[in-house]
Structure formats: C-alpha cells, structure tokens
Amino acid sequence: MGKTLKDIFYRFSDDQVAFRYGVALKLSSMSLIFVGLVMFFLYILLKIDLIFFNANQFPGAKEFQEAYFDFVFSNSIDLLPYILGSLIIIFFAGLYLTYLILRPFKLLSKYCDDVCNGKKGSFNPEMLTDHRLLIMFSDYFFSVSEQMIAENKFKLTAIPERFTKVHKPVYDWSFFMSYFLIILALTVLSIIGVITVDTGIREQIIELSTNFLKATPSVKYFLSEQFVVFDLIVYLLISFHVAIHFSFGFYLYSKVATPAFAIFSTMRSFLKGNKSARVHLIGYSYLRDDCRKINKYLDLLSKLPE
C-alpha cells in the first residue's frame, strides 16, 4: 500500500503529468463554472417569482412556494449524476487533448533516446499532421545526422531554403483547428446540457404555476417575459463560454508553438556548424525530459570528428 501511494505521489510530481492534469482540470473547471453561473441566475429568477407571487397575494402562492422548494431540491439531486458524468467526460477529453499536444515532442525525444542507447531510431513524420515545420525539419535533420553517424564525421550542411527564412514561431493552422474542434465539441456539450436543464426547469415552473396559482393573464405574461430575460442571460453566458474556450485554444497553442520553434531553431543552428547549440526552455518544465534527450543526442553528434 505504501509503495502504491509513493508511486502515485511521484507520478503526480512529474512535470508533464502535472501539466496534463492541469489542462484537464482547467477544461472541467470552465464547464463547471459555466453551469454554476447559469444555475445561479436561474435561481435568482425563480426567487423573483416567489417574491412576485407573494407580493401580489396570488391564491395558492404559499402552496406554490412549498412545491417550489421541493422541486428545486429534487431536480438538483436528479441533475447531479449528469453533471458529474459530463465533467468526467470533459476531464478525460482534456487528457487526450494534452496527449495530442505533446505527442510530436515525445516522438522526437524517443528517437533521440533510442539512438543514444544504441538502438535503431525510428521516426515516421507521416504519423503526425501537426507542427509541420518542426516535423518536416526534424525528418531532414535526422536523415542528415544518420549519415553523419554512419560516416563518423560531422560536416556542415546546407539548409533547404524553405527553412532559412523562418525566424519566429509560425501558426500551424491545421494544428490549431484540430484542437479547436475538440474544444468546440466540449463547449457544445456544455451548452446542450444547459439548454436541456433550462428547458426542463422552465416546463416544471410553468406546470407548478398552473397547478397552484390562478392562471391569470398577468401571471402568464410575467412568466413568459422572465424567461425571455433568462434566455438573454443564457446567450450572454454561452458567448462568454465560447470566447473563453477560444482564448484557451490560443493558450494551449502557445504552450507548444514556442517550444517547437526553439527545437527547430536549435537543430538548424547545429547543422550550420554551431555544435554547442542546445535546447534551453524556460517556463516549459513539462518538456524538460524530452529536451534533455534531444540535447543528449546533440551531444553525441557534437563529438563526431570534423
């Protein structure tokens, strides 16, 4: 038991694991906050209902209030499993998202580690559709370095023109759009859940009002108008939710675009003759182990005679 807990502790203390779980928790938290805000505004509107009915002394208002609290409690209990289930789905979707984000770096570092340990490295760029600049140049870099190792000689290498004019991180739209679609799917899941809850509660409130209150035109008008107001609130929250996920998409992209460019520029500089070039990333601890393996591979190449 003690060993198991110790393994779990060390696993969660790993920077990459912490990053993956952190992203997954952020995604889950955004959806949870979104649902919480919708429920909060709905609760306020329903409280206004009670105040309105009691202030106007509608017949059956007292019975309506008692039924209302029973309704809120029972519906909260009924919705809890669905909310928890959705959060679990979003959490694991976040873990999968981070797996996709880190996969190119893992493949690069695995190749470097295999070669350094005397194994035959395998790097298949066709497996990846993201980080095309890094992947395409890495494929070129590894083909050149394999030849150097085979000949046991380090030699300066001409850089293909398409790689010489890149001096800053570039947007890989295929990468960004693929991850944005995943984030959008999570947003749609949250929105569908909120609309379903909103529709169900709305129907219940109308039914309660019909059963316990005199169905006067003023009551019908008040209920219809208050739900119009609530719809506006929901639309605003949905817009905010989508905007947050857009921002989160750019945030995730920045977490890999800068390191990808750093590795690319280091490899390019190395082929130009800067044998001391190494990957040094500050603030990207979740890639520390991968960068260490890449640097170890560069150490191996730098020891080749010229």
Regions found by a protein language model. Name each.
Residues 1-19, 153-162, 273, 296-299, ...:
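Non-catalytic regulatory/interaction regions at protein termini and inter-domain linkers
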Residues 94, 104, 111, 140, ...:
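Short alpha-helical segment of the DHp
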Residues 94-113, 249-264:
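Cytoplasmic juxtamembrane amphipathic helix immediately C-terminal to a transmembrane segment
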Residues 242, 246, 250, 254-260, ...:
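Compact recognition or signaling/catalytic modules
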Residues 110-136, 265-282, 289, 304-306:
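Short, charged helix-helix connector/hinge segments
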Residues 4-103, 166-249:
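Alpha-helical transmembrane segments and their helix-membrane boundary motifs
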